[in-house]
């Protein structure tokens, strides 16, 4: 008789229930290996469309495809066991209609086995969020600075810093919550606005350049590890892995060129005749 241990993975309702409780910890991951490390300490792993910047070197997230998100989402699911895995819906996969959004989100859930999707937009996407949640697809919202809107925003700048600019962002937060999202990312907004949104909506807010008062925080893994050449103001670098990785690669290259590697301990001898 075999004994099987069931490992419970966090769900969207688990995260929703954290409103006003212990802060929610979230990081991005795009690979099975990094997912296995992040999974030990985080409640949520976001397979962000930021993979376009981090993995592929795109200037924006606009070129990212649904197929890219599904491939990396599946990898992160294989590498993790405990955290809720949320996969971003890329630009062009959900905006045209509620039906398009459903088909894209259903593909993501079916092909990656993740627990939720994330999409950008507030009031304008509320109907779509409701359509998805009513059909069994958990949705994480995303308001404030929305990177997929770079071509209309003109630049990646913080939102809500001017007098009288709060109301549209507050309306977005209310719309996302009322539509049934289980949580919402609030990106790059004035700190008092991030705090106010957190205090006034019923779902958890996950800040990225918003406020310490948010119900949770998220960063891009490579940014906080010191692997990105440029980091936004809201990023704290918890490591400086870039120089260490470069030193390791340099050491390897030097030893290969000098024939110091591989050494005797790294090669195979003949088996003794028996």
Curated annotation (Swiss-Prot):
Molecular-function annotations in GO: 3-methyl-2-oxobutanoate hydroxymethyltransferase activity; magnesium ion binding
Annotated EC: 2.1.2.11
Reactions it catalyzes: 3-methyl-2-oxobutanoate + (6R)-5,10-methylene-5,6,7,8-tetrahydrofolate + H2O = 2-dehydropantoate + (6S)-5,6,7,8-tetrahydrofolate
Compartmental location: Cytoplasm
Known partners and oligomeric status: Homodecamer; pentamer of dimers.
Source species, domain of life: Bacteria
Protein name, UniProt field: 3-methyl-2-oxobutanoate hydroxymethyltransferase
Active site as annotated: 187 (proton acceptor)
Cofactor binding note: Binds 1 Mg(2+) ion per subunit.
Organism: Rhodopseudomonas palustris (strain HaA2)
GO BP term (any one): pantothenate biosynthetic process
Binding sites annotated in the UniProt record for 3-methyl-2-oxobutanoate: 49-50, 88, 118
Pathways per UniProt: Cofactor biosynthesis; (R)-pantothenate biosynthesis; (R)-pantoate from 3-methyl-2-oxobutanoate: step 1/2
This protein's UniProt keywords: Cytoplasm, Magnesium, Metal-binding, Pantothenate biosynthesis, Transferase
PANTHER family per UniProt: 3-METHYL-2-OXOBUTANOATE HYDROXYMETHYLTRANSFERASE (PTHR20881:SF0)
Pfam families noted in UniProt: Pantoate_transf
Leading EC class: transferase
UniProt cofactor(s): Mg(2+)
Gene name of the encoded protein: panB
UniProt lineage: Bacteria, Pseudomonadati, Pseudomonadota, Alphaproteobacteria, Hyphomicrobiales
Residues annotated as binding Mg(2+): 49, 88, 120
Family membership noted in the UniProt record: Belongs to the PanB family.
Function: Catalyzes the reversible reaction in which hydroxymethyl group from 5,10-methylenetetrahydrofolate is transferred onto alpha-ketoisovalerate to form ketopantoate.
